Each structure stands twice: as structure tokens, then as C-alpha cells.
Amino acid sequence: MINSKQKIAVLGAGSWGTALAALVARHDYPTILWGRDVRVIQSIDIQHQNFRYLPSIMLPQTLRATTDLAAAVSGADWVLVAVPSYAFTETLCRLAPLLSIGVGVAWATKGFEPGSGRFLHEVAREILGGDAPLAVVTGPSFAKEVTLGLPTAVTVHGEDACFTQMVANAMHGPMFRAYTGNDVIGAELGGAMKNVLAVAIGVADGMQLGMNARAGLITRGLNEMLRLSAVIGARPETLMGLAGLGDLVLTCTGDLSRNRRLGFALGRGQSLSDAIREIGQVVESVQTSDEVMRHAEQNGVELPISEAVRAVLREEITPYAGMKVLLAREQKPEYLDILFKANCSL
């Protein structure tokens, strides 16, 4: 029987790329996963396991894997990019000449372009041109839980409604809900900022500051998301949904969160280099904290938690000093109307 479903190429054989490739393959979409590490790709293609990033979890036998990018995207109806933010631009530059006209590109990468601070949709539009359908996949989702088939909900945002729905349809299933929207800026902002804020919560947990401190930091962190969203063209309801609040809660409370684990290690007194080495995977917040503050400073928005995280990750202050700075801030109204008064101070 001929499979009439779209062929999907997933780029990035880390934990998240593998999880998403396995997800759509289980939904009977012909799927091929591309990655650079020959050993990882061979383990996926032959043994149906990603021994490095998702050990001991069996992947669908229908999922194919390759290190040949041209072979991966050949005949693909659309492409899903799931590489770290530092590799996003380079991956799209390699992808662009291989794409057929009309082939859409979605990405599950969270963060900004390192160095420039550009949103990833801006990078994608510049490289892929004005006609390529684009979408971003984001929301509270640990790769391991998705691969194990545990219930998950994400959101897909894009300006092209048909392509956005196509991506969501491929992912949506009995244990995986995919919602849709068209606020690309808000979706990307939430996915980037939550990583920075998770470091602060991790630090507080590592310092054993208690559950009250955790709740306060999460709530005021959401306030920072909303504040920045109001001046860069994002919609506040996006940040109150899966792309913002949902992802923030998961990343700040889940032990699988690399960014929270980094903060926890720093709060326990570990050095930044040792903590990153122990985690063994990319920790997006190290780069993203600079880019978040770049946007805040360009727009005159005060983000004290994000600013403290940046200073800690730059090793300009200790985690203890960072918490003291936050606790010493002047008392003021909570400003529940921050959705409309973006420039009032926290």
C-alpha cells in the first residue's frame, strides 16, 4: 500500500530532533533524520536507538537516519529543523540550495541567533526567501517524555495558516496535542526566555531558598516575558499559553531541564565550566541570556532576573550576590496591568 502522507526530513539528531522524528514516524509519516555524528546516526538507523541522547529507548523501525543532508531533504514535503541555536544559521545556509520551491521549513530550535540577537524567523526568512512557508514549534516538552509516549502539548505558530496546520497535523496524536497560532514573535520569545529564567530558579533551588522563592521567581519571570513581549510586537496571550507560561513552568521545575540543572549546580557552588561539562549537552541559556538582555536594553525594558542571570553566567557576580541584588530591590506595586504598561519598572 502506498503511503500518501507527506515525507518529512528532520534535521538534528540530538534528543529533541530524535524525539520529534520518532513522533511523526509513529504517526506513519515517512521520516528521515539527519545528523552529523556518524555513530549516533548508525545507532538510530540500524539499532533503532539514539545511544547518546536517548539511551535505552526504542525508536520506530520505520525511522531512517543519514549523515547526507542532500539525501535527507530529497523529495521532502517539508523540513523540521531541531538543531541548537548556534547551528541554526549554518544549517539553513546548507539547506537552502537543496530545497525545492514551495517546501516549507519549521523549526523546534529555541533561542536567538548568537551574536546578532535576531529572532530565528528573521534568520530563516533572510536565508530561505520570502516565499518559503515557515513555522515554529514550541511549548513545554521534554524530549525523553515525548519519546516515551507520555502526554504532551505544544503549539505551532506561523504566518502561513495551511503550512502551520500541516505541521501540527503531523505531530498531533493520541498522546501529543499540537495547537496552532500565528504569533511567531511571541512563540519564539517564550521559548528563548524560559531557558534564562530556569537558571535563576535552579540557582534558588541549589541554594535551598525554598518553594516560596521558586514560586516568586517563576511569577516575576513571567512578568519579564510579558514586559518584553509588549514592546517587540508579541501578543501577551501567547506568553500566557504553552509557548510562555507552559514552557516556563516545565523548564523551571523539571529535573530533565538542562538550564535548571545548570542553575542548580551553580547554586551549589560548582563552577560554570564544570557544570556545563557535567550536563554534557548544549545549555542554551549561556548564550541566550546575552541576547535577551540585548533586546531589553535596545527597548528600554528592565528585566532584573534575566539581568542577574546574565551576570552570573558571565561570572561577573556569584549566584549568592545575584540573589541579594534581587532581594534588595525597592518595594513597589505589583503592577498587574503590565500588559498595557510595558515600561513601568518591576
From Swiss-Prot:
It catalyses: sn-glycerol 3-phosphate + NAD(+) = dihydroxyacetone phosphate + NADH + H(+); sn-glycerol 3-phosphate + NADP(+) = dihydroxyacetone phosphate + NADPH + H(+). It comes from the Bacteria. Sn-glycerol 3-phosphate binds at residues 110, 139, 141, 194, 247, 257-259. Its main location: cytoplasm. One of its GO terms (biological process) is glycerophospholipid biosynthetic process. The active site is at 194 (proton acceptor). It is found in: Cytoplasm. GO terms for molecular function: glycerol-3-phosphate dehydrogenase [NAD(P)+] activity; NAD binding. Pathway: Membrane lipid metabolism; glycerophospholipid metabolism. One of its GO terms (cellular component) is cytosol. Disulfide bonds: none annotated. The keyword Lyase does not apply. It holds the Pfam family NAD_Gly3P_dh_C. It is an enzyme of class 1 (oxidoreductase). Keywords: Cytoplasm, Lipid biosynthesis, Lipid metabolism, NAD, NADP, Nucleotide-binding, Oxidoreductase, Phospholipid biosynthesis, Phospholipid metabolism. Its EC number is 1.1.1.94. InterPro entries: 6-PGluconate_DH-like_C_sf, 6PGD_dom2, G3P_DH_NAD-dep, G3P_DH_NAD-dep_C, G3P_DH_NAD-dep_N, NAD(P)-bd_dom_sf. NADPH binds at residues 15-16, 36, 110, 143, 258, 282, 284. Catalyzes the reduction of the glycolytic intermediate dihydroxyacetone phosphate (DHAP) to sn-glycerol 3-phosphate (G3P), the key precursor for phospholipid synthesis. Belongs to the NAD-dependent glycerol-3-phosphate dehydrogenase family. This is Glycerol-3-phosphate dehydrogenase [NAD(P)+]. It comes from Xylella fastidiosa (strain M23). The lineage of its organism: Bacteria, Pseudomonadati, Pseudomonadota, Gammaproteobacteria, Lysobacterales.
